[in-house]
Amino acid sequence: MHDSLTIALLQAREAAMSYFRPIVKRHNLTEQQWRIVRILAESPSMDFHDLAYRACILRPSLTGILTRMERDGLVLRLKPINDQRKLYISLTKEGQALYNRAQTQIEEAYRQIEAQFTAEKMQQLTHLLEEFIALGNSRQEDIPGDNE
């Protein structure tokens, strides 16, 4: 048993990434870039702040990552005419094609995990983590300060 929940969660993340990291590297992406591609593949366009939150990337870091991804032709940054303060991000056709190529390999990695850990345990773990995340999110809402 782990004495530290945060260390156990980090070690679990590393264990999971051992299945996915080689795939991400094969597609010449960083882990952060893959998170962005995966999130945007599920949403046609996303607000910059929402993307930062969902990808667990600090906004200043996200700016640099998106600049490189835009240069590589994977994403577009769009500002609405009616609100120049907003910034939306979407995948390009090339970004979507990259996601489609990688996704087959990602699904195979999930099958490997389920074969070793079982689909039932994966479902239980995911459910428990979602509950814990919701608990943490509700605590963050109670903290005074910048809650954008």
Curated annotation (Swiss-Prot):
One Pfam family here: MarR
Keyword set includes Metal-binding: no
Biological process annotations from GO: negative regulation of DNA-templated transcription; response to stress
InterPro entries cross-referenced by the UniProt entry: HpaR/FarR, HTH_MarR-typ, MarR/SlyA-like, Tscrpt_reg_MarR-type_CS, WH-like_DNA-bd_sf, WH_DNA-bd_sf
HTH marR-type domain residues: 2-134
PANTHER family reported in the protein's UniProt record: 4-HYDROXYPHENYLACETATE CATABOLISM PROTEIN, TRANSCRIPTIONAL REGULATOR, MARR FAMILY
Alphabetical list of PROSITE patterns matching this protein: HTH_MARR_1 (PS01117), HTH_MARR_2 (PS50995)
Lineage: Bacteria, Pseudomonadati, Pseudomonadota, Gammaproteobacteria, Enterobacterales
Keyword Transcription: yes
Disulfide cross-links: none
Alphabetic keyword roster: DNA-binding, Repressor, Transcription, Transcription regulation
Signal sequence residues: none
Protein name: Homoprotocatechuate degradative operon repressor
GO molecular function: DNA binding; DNA-binding transcription factor activity
Underlying gene: hpcR
Summary of the function given for this chain in its UniProt record: Repressor for the homoprotocatechuate catabolic pathway hpc operon.
